Amino acid sequence: MRRNVDLTYIVMNNQIYGLTTGQLSPTSLKGMKTKSTPFGSVENPVNPIPLAMVAGATYVARGFTGQQKHLVELIKGGIEHKGFALIDTFSPCVTYNHDNTHEFFKQRTRKLEEMGHDATNFQAAMEQGYRWGEVIPIGLFWQRGDLPTLDQLEPVLGDGGPLAHRPLGVAPELARALVKELM
């Protein structure tokens, strides 16, 4: 994130590892009971929003699969953004997460855009990122477009694209000799 790689990273945040039959994930809430933690989680959850912001992401958003049009706009914005975009996506696990259900998020999520949030205000974005309870903000928390991306800072990356797609630049007879030596 700190290098501002031009990449959109979408986190499917269901607060549990459903494919491993319901084990805790880094975003599971403290006290959550699962097969692997029958007495409840003793750890505080990782919060992707402030984590991404302090790590240097230049586009930080959160969406909810229950509000698909809004989520699509956030993803589109992340893809169009020049720099590292993180989109934390609430996607409730219907099998193993019985606490943070679709209905739970439907009742609590509120769009930042409708709350008058300024996505260029770092402090306000951090405050909204830590907000959790009766109101859980979704939308664009933070966006900064004035920082160069890694490919703009690293000249070799802008010189002909990825190395794998560039011509080898080795005479065929030398390449054959190298392969023969390695065999």
Set out the residue ranges of the language-model regions.
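Short, hinge-like loop/turn segments at secondary-structure boundaries
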Residues: 25-29, 78, 103-106
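Short acidic/glycine-rich loop or secondary-structure boundary segments that cap or lie
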Residues: 18-19, 69-71, 87, 94-99, ...
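Active-site rim beta-loop-alpha module in soluble metabolic enzymes
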Residues: 56-63, 82, 89-97
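Flexible, low-complexity linker and terminal segments
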Residues: 93-183
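Conserved thiamine diphosphate
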Residues: 32-77
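Active-site-proximal loop->helix
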Residues: 19-31, 51
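Short beta-strand segments
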Residues: 8-13, 88-90, 141-143
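Thiamine diphosphate
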Residues: 1-18, 70-73
